[in-house]
Amino acid sequence: MELTTTQIFVELILSLIPATLAFNLGKELTK
């Protein structure tokens, strides 16, 4: 299966969302 640029971009965003949420949560907890 060939990945298009759009699919790669979507996968990248979806993988970054949980990391961003965890990072922000960690910042809130360590205030």
From Swiss-Prot:
The keyword Electron transport does not apply. It comes from Phacus acuminatus. It is found in: Plastid, Chloroplast thylakoid membrane. Its main location: plastid. The chain crosses the membrane at residues 7-26. Keywords: Chloroplast, Membrane, Photosynthesis, Photosystem I, Plastid, Thylakoid, Transmembrane, Transmembrane helix. One of its GO terms (cellular component) is photosystem I. Belongs to the PsaM family. This is Photosystem I reaction center subunit XII. GO terms for biological process: photosynthesis. The gene is psaM. NCBIfam families: PS_I_psaM. HAMAP family: PSI_PsaM. Pfam families: PsaM. SUPFAM superfamilies: Subunit XII of photosystem I reaction centre, PsaM (SSF81548). InterPro entries: PSI_PsaM (IPR010010), PSI_PsaM_sf (IPR037279). Coiled coil: none annotated. It is a single-pass membrane protein.
